[in-house]
């Protein structure tokens, strides 16, 4: 999608592709986090001026929210697909392997944008942190519901706490994404996947 935006006093309007600019902003946020990404970093990567950024995306917070939407569409589709797996163990396996494929890829920044941004500590970043936590909570609620269904179907032991199992799995995934961001190899992350699955409760 093309957007024609005019910077006052700059002559002819400058044409740029909004989706390409947003993808560039996503890479900056993913690499540096919300607080670490300056407006100069963003405009340079996007190839636009600050007035063009404000006109197309609003402020930095609004730009990040749009980038987070793009990140979820492009990098987190495996989450919804995993919930459709026939067994709870397969749900866990698809989530774990999906996290490795998404966050340890050599084709883009490593680590998880949500994890990076949820630990932002400045007051200005509080709305962003709250937004990331809210989105994560929605995904976790869906996972709890899936594990409750697995218990009802006899796929998980009746004494398993679905909330606790979800928290355990999320903690493993978040730990893996942090390690991926720190440069852990796919082989090392795969070993974590295998260990986690070996400990998975069986009915």
Where are these regions (language model features)?
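Amphipathic alpha-helical packing segments from all-alpha helical-bundle domains
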Residues: 76, 126-153, 164, 191-194
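Hydrophobic alpha-helical connector segments
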Residues: 66, 79-110, 162-169
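Amphipathic alpha-helical segments used for helix-helix packing
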Residues: 91-92, 106-129
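Helix-turn-helix
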Residues: 9, 20, 24, 28-62, ...
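Amphipathic C-terminal alpha-helical segment
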Residues: 102-105, 149, 169-186, 199-203
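Hydrophobic alpha-helical segments that form the core
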Residues: 2, 110-116, 158-179, 191-199
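Short, basic, alpha-helical segments at the C-terminal edge of helix-turn-helix-like DNA-binding modules
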Residues: 69-75
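N-terminal intrinsically disordered/low-complexity leader segments
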Residues: 1-16, 159-160
């Amino acid at each position: 999608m093309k957007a024609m935006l005019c910077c006052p006093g700059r002559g002819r309007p400058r044409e740029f592709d909004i989706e390409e600019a947003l993808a560039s902003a996503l890479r900056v946020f993913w690499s540096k986090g919300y607080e670490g990404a300056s407006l100069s970093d963003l405009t340079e990567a996007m190839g636009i001026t600050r007035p063009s950024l404000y006109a197309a995306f609003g402020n930095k917070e609004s730009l990040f929210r749009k980038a987070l939407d793009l990140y979820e569409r492009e990098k987190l589709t495996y989450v919804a697909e995993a919930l459709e797996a026939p067994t709870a163990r397969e749900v866990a396996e698809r989530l774990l392997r999906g996290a490795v494929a998404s966050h340890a890829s050599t084709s883009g920044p490593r680590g998880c944008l949500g994890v990076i941004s949820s630990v932002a500590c400045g007051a200005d970043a509080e709305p962003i942190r709250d937004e990331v936590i809210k989105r994560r909570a929605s995904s976790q609620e869906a996972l709890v519901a899936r594990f409750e269904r697995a218990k009802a179907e006899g796929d998980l032991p009746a004494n398993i706490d679905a909330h606790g199992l979800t928290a355990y799995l999320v903690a493993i995934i978040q730990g893996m994404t942090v390690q991926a961001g720190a440069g852990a190899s796919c082989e090392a992350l795969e070993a974590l996947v295998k260990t986690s699955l070996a400990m998975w409760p069986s009915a």
